[in-house]
């Protein structure tokens, strides 16, 4: 072993500890263990009281500093007799000599956790109450100890207390372990400071005029899982979650099946969002982030699944299924006959998971309904794109605001199918054409680089079912050829955004074919 490796593995005995915690979980067991091992404990405020109340020897920090706690506890540990003991690098003889000259003892261990700032904000507390939960002394002690990791070990999580006691019994932490603890401590501080800075920016100093895109924004991410690989086996991948965000698919509970893959997550996310684009019971079947089928039903979720599957049974093989309502036993029995990678729903009826679990590999997830709002992030080389999610909530998404360009007004059943097709189209990669009937997609043309090819693909997939169906297009028809392709296949009504310089030609083609044509004034590209 090299000399550097030997230094990393050498243990530094723990003789003196500084403890100051808001979260008292595990505190007494820790203090008892340290006391039994002969470690001197210095502590603050309520932490010192909790330790002393158990008959455990503890030195209040004010005895160390000779200065009382002041300003409602805002100043307790911000004192040279504390921070010199934290920051003295005992590898340097001059630091050790300075401590001896000043009569200051060094600490080998710091145990600190911070005021619950984020929890206070989420509770709806007042601005002043939130400000009081911005930790100053605790953050300073953690940063000082982490900086001085050659001499001090720092622990910020009660889950680490077992390791502390094991290290004390084993002769102390190694330098390698102290480096790891220091890294974890700075991660903890960074996450905390990002939360404070974000709140300050949005609450105390919002930009004027107000904007959804501030000059600065910060987020912290925690690794939730290392995945088998990325989109392809030669790519490494992992899942990270935002601890400050509301629960989403990344926090889904897996009830059965193999570990989720990268592609499972991307497809499940697309399916989950597509299913919740609709108010009725809806099932979306997704593969490669595109719909194999989407359907709604007023009868049952099983009926919605049956209709979604019938759209494209061949492509649905090995797909990902999402339902926006509880999966019934009937639906589970149908799904169990089909090779399925993932099924995700808000809940499952009694017995449904047992039926699905007969297939050992299918991943069965429970996830909360996706929350509206937030931001979508997409990395680009050297930067990051941010946009508001496309949520089908514009005026143009309401059929009451559609413009009838030509043809007879759609009857109730036809209009219902047009609305369904329009909402389903949001989930399809552009250029997108969705042909629908009876609350179900029957032909989907997706991801084409021109709209007429998307129309041809949708017609080909729909086959004989296209006659009498309706169509939604995610963007305008730039030429009449796409609409003519659909009209020749027998569709009766089409909805599209409009806005092309050739809108008049497209409308004339619809009039000639006897097709009802609506304009929404809003598009729904997906890239």
Swiss-Prot record:
Keyword Iron-sulfur: no
Reactions this protein catalyses: (6R)-10-formyltetrahydrofolate + 5-amino-1-(5-phospho-beta-D-ribosyl)imidazole-4-carboxamide = 5-formamido-1-(5-phospho-D-ribosyl)imidazole-4-carboxamide + (6S)-5,6,7,8-tetrahydrofolate; IMP + H2O = 5-formamido-1-(5-phospho-D-ribosyl)imidazole-4-carboxamide
Entry comment, domain topic: The IMP cyclohydrolase activity resides in the N-terminal region.
Protein origin, superkingdom: Bacteria
Record InterPro entries: AICAR_Tfase_dup_dom_sf, Cytidine_deaminase-like, MGS-like_dom, MGS-like_dom_sf, PurH-like
EC number: 2.1.2.3, 3.5.4.10
SUPFAM superfamilies xref list: Cytidine deaminase-like, Methylglyoxal synthase-like
Pfam families: AICARFT_IMPCHas, MGS
Coiled coil location: none
GO MF annotation list: IMP cyclohydrolase activity; phosphoribosylaminoimidazolecarboxamide formyltransferase activity
Transferase in keyword set: yes
Protein name: Bifunctional purine biosynthesis protein PurH
Record-level GO cellular component terms: cytosol
Listed GO biological process terms: 'de novo' IMP biosynthetic process
Positions of the MGS-like domain: 9-156
Known pathway: Purine metabolism; IMP biosynthesis via de novo pathway; 5-formamido-1-(5-phospho-D-ribosyl)imidazole-4-carboxamide from 5-amino-1-(5-phospho-D-ribosyl)imidazole-4-carboxamide (10-formyl THF route): step 1/1; Purine metabolism; IMP biosynthesis via de novo pathway; IMP from 5-formamido-1-(5-phospho-D-ribosyl)imidazole-4-carboxamide: step 1/1
Family affiliation: Belongs to the PurH family.
TM spans (from-to): none
Record key words, sorted: Hydrolase, Multifunctional enzyme, Purine biosynthesis, Transferase
């Amino acid at each position: 072993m090299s000399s550097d490796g030997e230094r990393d593995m050498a243990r530094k005995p723990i003789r003196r500890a500084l403890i100051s915690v808001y979260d008292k979980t595990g505190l007494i067991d820790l203090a008892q263990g340290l006391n039994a091992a002969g470690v001197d404990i210095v502590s603050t405020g309520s932490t010192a009281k909790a330790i002393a109340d158990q008959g455990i020897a503890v030195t209040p920090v004010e005895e160390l500093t000779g200065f009382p706690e002041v300003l409602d506890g805002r100043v307790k540990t911000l004192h040279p007799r504390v921070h010199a003991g934290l920051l003295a690098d005992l590898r340097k003889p001059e630091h050790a000599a300075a401590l001896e000259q000043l009569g200051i003892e060094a600490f080998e261990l710091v145990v600190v956790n911070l005021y619950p700032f984020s929890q206070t904000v989420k509770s709806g507390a007042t601005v002043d109450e939130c400000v009081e939960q911005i930790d100053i002394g605790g953050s300073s002690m953690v940063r000082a100890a982490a900086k001085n990791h050659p001499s001090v070990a720092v622990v910020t999580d009660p889950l680490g207390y077992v390791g502390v006691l094991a290290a004390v019994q084993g002769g102390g932490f190694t330098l390698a372990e102290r480096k790891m603890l220091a890294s974890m401590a700075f991660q903890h501080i960074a996450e905390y400071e990002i939360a404070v800075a974000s709140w300050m920016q949005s609450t105390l100093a919002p930009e004027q005029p107000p904007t959804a895109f501030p000059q600065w924004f910060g987020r912290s991410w925690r690794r939730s899982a290392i995945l088998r690989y990325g989109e392809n086996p030669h790519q490494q991948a992992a899942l990270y979650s935002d601890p400050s965000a509301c629960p989403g698919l990344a926090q889904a509970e897996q009830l059965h099946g193999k570990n989720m893959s990268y592609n499972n997550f991307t497809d499940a996310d697309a399916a989950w969002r597509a299913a919740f684009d609709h108010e009725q019971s809806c099932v979306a079947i997704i593969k490669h982030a595109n719909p194999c089928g989407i359907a709604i039903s007023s009868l049952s979720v099983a009926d919605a699944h049956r209709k979604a599957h019938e759209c494209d049974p061949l492509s649905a093989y090995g797909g990902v299924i999402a339902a926006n309502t509880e999966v019934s036993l009937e639906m589970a029995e149908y799904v169990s006959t089909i090779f399925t990678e993932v099924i995700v729903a808000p809940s499952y009826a009694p017995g449904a998971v047992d039926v699905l679990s007969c297939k050992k590999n299918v991943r069965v997830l429970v996830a909360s309904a996706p929350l509206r709002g937030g931001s979508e992030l997409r990395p680009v080389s050297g930067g990051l794109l941010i946009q508001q999610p496309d949520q089908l909530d514009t005026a143009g998404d309401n059929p009451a605001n559609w413009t009838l360009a030509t043809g007879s007004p759609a009857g109730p059943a036809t209009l219902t199918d047009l609305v369904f097709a329009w909402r389903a189209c949001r989930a399809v990669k552009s250029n997108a054409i969705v042909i629908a009937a009876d609350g179900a997609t029957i032909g989907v043309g997706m991801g084409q680089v021109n709209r007429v090819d998307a129309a041809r693909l949708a017609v080909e997939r729909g086959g004989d079912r296209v006659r009498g169906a309706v169509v939604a297009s995610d963007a305008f028809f730039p030429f009449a050829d796409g609409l003519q392709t659909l009209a020749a296949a027998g569709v009766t009504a089409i909805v599209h955004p409009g806005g092309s310089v050739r809108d008049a030609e497209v409308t004339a083609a619809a009039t000639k074919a006897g097709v009802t044509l609506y304009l929404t004034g809003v598009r729904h590209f997906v890239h």
